[in-house]
């Protein structure tokens, strides 16, 4: 049975939505959970019937969002440190955390270690597109500054994830740039273009709109651009939702029409909501770590756990190592 460590104290809203998500996941599938945190705060939130599938690991500290990522390495009593140590010692198959993403990434990289031939791990996230599907984008925050070889490795890892986890038989990989032509981009992206061209899956440069039109399956960029893209997309989706609500309320006819469109709005909300996707895997480490949104609700945590189970049941890390070995110097 898959065993997952969950940082029960991470996230913006405390343990309540995290524990609720764990319970919802246990209702739907079989796995063993290790909840890391303050057991006195956690246990009262769990129905007794689920306790047989849950173990507890006491952690006295929590890494706050205001702290630096490197500070986490010194905080050995923190919930995320202890969760990562379980993965390092192979006592669990995966870690899920909605806490400090920088701390989670630093600990996973330095304590669990990287896969062979991976210079830097990357955070990969799914974004909705107009084809009623998703586009995998990486990196979305792990690496602010990248060299061309890092972007090439992201492309290999993204392609492998698309095949193994998303079941895309022939994924199309694009390099995010300011134009489709090979001559577009900065010096790093131009160098990366030459490297990524070695992949049969590479379809060339991709512009920002292609993240959402379904023309590519994997978008590669550095973490600085990727994080801005992610946060901007979240902001636009939220703003459009609010604009629609305000406009509907201004007209009785629009209100009547919105009732008829309720199913459409529900489907749209489901497609663009982050909680449908759960979290973002940290690709390139010697294990499975899912980084969830700090504002994760119970549904997001549940789906992050499902993500972790799928990852742990796959051969994705082996595939990444094998693919990168073909290009090792």
UniProtKB/Swiss-Prot annotation:
A GO biological-process term: fatty acid biosynthetic process
Enzyme Commission code(s) on record: 2.3.1.274
SUPFAM superfamilies with a match to the protein in the record: Isocitrate/Isopropylmalate dehydrogenase-like (SSF53659)
Broad enzyme group: transferase
Cellular component GO terms, alphabetical: cytoplasm
Reaction equations catalysed: a fatty acyl-[ACP] + phosphate = an acyl phosphate + holo-[ACP]
InterPro entries in alphabetical order: FA_synthesis, Phospholipid_synth_PlsX-like
Entry annotated with the keyword Cytoplasm: yes
Any one Gene Ontology molecular-function term assigned to this protein's record: phosphate:acyl-[acyl carrier protein] acyltransferase activity
Role summary: Catalyzes the reversible formation of acyl-phosphate (acyl-PO(4)) from acyl-[acyl-carrier-protein] (acyl-ACP). This enzyme utilizes acyl-ACP as fatty acyl donor, but not acyl-CoA.
Family stated for the protein in its record: Belongs to the PlsX family.
HAMAP family: PlsX (MF_00019)
Protein's name in the database: Phosphate acyltransferase
Gene: plsX
